[in-house]
From Swiss-Prot:
NCBIfam families: glmM. Catalyzes the conversion of glucosamine-6-phosphate to glucosamine-1-phosphate. One of its GO terms (cellular component) is cytosol. This is Phosphoglucosamine mutase. The keyword Metal-binding applies. Binds 1 Mg(2+) ion per subunit. It comes from Solibacter usitatus (strain Ellin6076). The modification Phosphoserine is found at residue 102. Activated by phosphorylation. Gene3D superfamilies: Alpha-D-Glucose-1,6-Bisphosphate, subunit A, domain 3 (3.40.120.10), Alpha-D-phosphohexomutase, C-terminal domain (3.30.310.50). Its EC number is 5.4.2.10.
């Protein structure tokens, strides 16, 4: 049975509107509390949030629902998604809830659940929780929010863990950090200052409404300018919940998740720590990355988009490294989810050991032209079953003759069809992606 509430990254929506209205959020807490009671007599549940203004009332409603089922709730306050995953798997928690909509605007929010092992819940368990939510909504009760007190030691515990992972010292290194006015706004500057870095911060002043606003991992212009203006050795931008990072080299060039995977994959292989000489990525990763891995004797395995699917394949294969072009990178030895700050630590360490900057680490990576077009759609059903869409995709694939790629899929979190076309010629890529998007827009656009 297909899920209606849970997407590729939990439940997402506009805060205050279904499925993040007060009744449904409270029902989510009740449903999760019932699920948790199956695993422990007095389950402890961790809650964390990013900096959105809706985070507090959502947390209190979730907590109220959990408490109604006998669960004990502990609140970390503002913390990153990987912070919640880490604390959940290392503490006594049955589950952890992160309240965030990642890179989305401030008026969106979301609910992401981690099991006691620190992994996102499997689809079948999400479906059971979802079915209970629907049952509860048939006879709703007045939500009873629970006032929460932030337990700062929880955040300190996560920061201490990160600080101890790497032997890297950043004395004499200038790092520019864009926290996207999100969950990392305190933690990232403190982490890198503690390692000796001279830290330049931008967009580290959240007000509840400026998260991801022209800043962070999806808007790199300000960071690029800051790196060049302050002559920083590295720049790093996090998204709203800091489960991903995108980097900027000292020359102001963007270093995305594909380049990070290549640098980290080769370093792990050289150290004898790349299990099976395999790296897991997604269908969005560039052809150039696949060919660079081939040249290095590393196999790249692709999954559907979503770090959840990357991690599932990593576990299945026993892989040590996986990630996405968007900047989610998973080091399985240290984390059960993408962690932007951990990725930064590892990448800076690799650059330091190589005695180079970020530009030089992946100078041989040839990026094929790639274009992504988003088309807003009426509903997310039957995209590839539409004859006109299927015909246009076949036409483009035939024209490429095996030299390019076409990927058409629905977004897991928004009412969008995403068209990705990649090939050796930019003009051709732009033409083909536009033609496919036009057909989709005509067939099922809003």
């Amino acid at each position: 049975m297909a899920k209606d509430l849970f997407g590729t990254d939990g439940i997402r929506g506009v805060a205050g509107q279904y499925p993040l209205d007060r009744d449904t959020v409270y029902a989510f807490g009740v449903a999760l509390g019932k699920d948790a009671a199956l695993h422990a007599a007095k389950p402890e549940i961790l809650i964390g949030a990013d900096t959105r203004e809706s985070g507090t009332w959502i947390a209190e409603l979730v907590a109220g629902g959990l408490a109604s089922q006998g669960a004990q709730v502990r609140y970390a306050g503002v913390i990153t998604t990987p912070g919640v995953a880490y604390l959940t798997r290392t503490g006594s928690f049955v589950a952890g809830v992160m309240i965030s909509a990642s890179h989305n605007p401030y008026d969106d929010n979301g609910l992401k659940v981690f099991g006691h092992s620190g992994f996102k819940l499997p689809d079948d368990e999400e479906l059971l929780i979802e079915q209970e939510i629907f049952r509860l909504r048939e006879a709703p009760v007045a939500p009873q929010p629970l006032s929460l007190t932030v337990e700062e030691p929880l955040v300190r515990q996560y920061l201490k863990y990160l600080s101890g992972i790497s032997s890297v010292r950043l004395d004499g290194v200038r790092v520019a950090i864009d926290c996207g006015n999100g969950a990392s706004y305190r933690l990232a500057p403190e982490l890198f200052q503690g390692l000796g870095a001279d830290v330049v911060t931008i967009c580290c002043e959240p007000n509840g409404r400026n998260i991801n606003l022209n800043c962070g991992a999806l808007h790199l212009e300000a960071l690029q300018q800051a790196v060049v203006a302050h002559r920083a050795h590295f720049g790093v931008a996090f998204d709203g919940d800091a489960d991903r990072a995108i980097f900027v080299s000292s020359s102001g060039q963007v270093v995305n998740g594909d380049a990070v995977l290549l640098a980290c994959g080769r370093a792990l292989k050289a150290a004898g720590k790349l299990a099976g000489n395999t790296v897991v990525s997604t269908v969005m990763s560039n052809l150039g990355l696949e060919r660079a891995f081939d040249a290095a004797g590393i196999r790249m395995v692709r999954t559907p988009v979503g770090d959840k699917y990357v991690l599932e394949e990593m576990v299945r294969l026993g892989a040590a490294l996986g990630g996405e072009q968007s900047g989610h990178v998973i080091f399985r030895e240290y984390s059960t989810t993408g962690d932007g700050m951990l990725t930064a630590l590892r990448l800076f360490e690799i650059a330091q050991q190589a005695g180079t900057g970020l530009d030089e680490l992946t100078a041989d990576l040839k990026i094929y032209p790639q274009r992504l077009v988003n088309v807003r759609v009426r509903e997310k059903k039957g995209l590839l079953e539409l004859p006109a869409v299927a015909k246009e995709i076949r036409r483009v694939e035939d024209a490429f003759g095996g030299a390019g790629r076409v990927l058409v899929r629905f977004s897991g979190t928004e009412p969008l069809a995403r068209v990705m076309v990649e090939g050796p010629n930019l003009e051709q890529v732009e033409s083909f992606s536009t033609s496919i998007a036009d057909v989709i827009r005509r067939e099922m656009g809003e």
